Amino acid sequence: MLDIEGTTCPTSFVSDTLYPYAYSHLEGFLNEHRENNEIQSLIDEAWREWQADTDASSKDLLSKALRKNSSEIVNICSYLHHLITIDRKSSALKDLQGRIWREGYEKGDLCSSLYPETIEALRKLKQQDYVLAVYSSGSISAQKLLYRHTADGDQTALFSHWFDTRTGNKKESRSYSDISIAMNIPVEKVLFVSDSYAECNAAEKSGMSVLFSLREGNPEQDPHDHKAIKELCCLFDYLL
């Protein structure tokens, strides 16, 4: 089971390409699709998240928004832009970002950037009958878009399972136990690869084997007590 950012895809593609694209297109997208029931539900969900947000900067932003005579779209965009800026995980935001990126991929504005060895390693795993799964903080829709729009074509058929934060927090061991049940695979037979020490800890606590993705450019560079790999092809040394 693989994380995406910092594991199969450079963090720079997400931080320097995908996030800025969603940021700049967010308000226009919401205005264009505001009559769509699904989009309105996501706006409502984001409002509920904002009202429950205990972060001081978020509360201050909400207070200012309520005092202004701005439209609902302008107000909620200020919060969503804030979440993007501080890289806060939000299910509503992730869903909206995925929809914006879909339009970007379909228009040809975006093309996924994966590590050079990623596709070859994934294909080799598939050929050896390993079950491949994704667990990322990005929405499942966004995950599939990333693997569908690569320079080498659609790679989504390589994966059997897709999981995002709607399954559970990636830093909580219960999430990994639930994923094991969903895949119908004993937890001790799952190997999880991530660039996050906290995620590796949570997965290991659930009973999974873990590998820390130690790539140049990743925010975290200390695997602590976890075994680390510097390229995805290196994980074959740890497979049963």
UniProtKB/Swiss-Prot annotation:
<dbReference type="InterPro" id="IPR023943">
    <property type="entry name" value="Enolase-ppase_E1"/>
</dbReference>
<comment type="subunit">
    <text>Monomer.</text>
</comment>
<dbReference type="GO" id="GO:0000287">
    <property type="term" value="F:magnesium ion binding"/>
</dbReference>
<protein>
    <recommendedName>
        <fullName>Enolase-phosphatase E1</fullName>
        <ecNumber>3.1.3.77</ecNumber>
    </recommendedName>
</protein>
<comment type="similarity">
    <text>Belongs to the HAD-like hydrolase superfamily. MasA/MtnC family.</text>
</comment>
<comment type="pathway">
    <text>Amino-acid biosynthesis; L-methionine biosynthesis via salvage pathway; L-methionine from S-methyl-5-thio-alpha-D-ribose 1-phosphate: step 3/6.</text>
</comment>
<keyword id="KW-0460">Magnesium</keyword>
<keyword id="KW-0479">Metal-binding</keyword>
<keyword id="KW-0028">Amino-acid biosynthesis</keyword>
<dbReference type="GO" id="GO:0019509">
    <property type="term" value="P:L-methionine salvage from methylthioadenosine"/>
</dbReference>
<dbReference type="InterPro" id="IPR036412">
    <property type="entry name" value="HAD-like_sf"/>
</dbReference>
<dbReference type="GO" id="GO:0043716">
    <property type="term" value="F:2-hydroxy-3-keto-5-methylthiopentenyl-1-phosphate phosphatase activity"/>
</dbReference>
<dbReference type="GO" id="GO:0043874">
    <property type="term" value="F:acireductone synthase activity"/>
</dbReference>
<dbReference type="GO" id="GO:0043715">
    <property type="term" value="F:2,3-diketo-5-methylthiopentyl-1-phosphate enolase activity"/>
</dbReference>
<comment type="function">
    <text>Bifunctional enzyme that catalyzes the enolization of 2,3-diketo-5-methylthiopentyl-1-phosphate (DK-MTP-1-P) into the intermediate 2-hydroxy-3-keto-5-methylthiopentenyl-1-phosphate (HK-MTPenyl-1-P), which is then dephosphorylated to form the acireductone 1,2-dihydroxy-3-keto-5-methylthiopentene (DHK-MTPene).</text>
</comment>
<keyword id="KW-0378">Hydrolase</keyword>
<dbReference type="Pfam" id="PF00702">
    <property type="entry name" value="Hydrolase"/>
</dbReference>
<dbReference type="InterPro" id="IPR023214">
    <property type="entry name" value="HAD_sf"/>
</dbReference>
<comment type="pathway">
    <text>Amino-acid biosynthesis; L-methionine biosynthesis via salvage pathway; L-methionine from S-methyl-5-thio-alpha-D-ribose 1-phosphate: step 4/6.</text>
</comment>
<keyword id="KW-0486">Methionine biosynthesis</keyword>
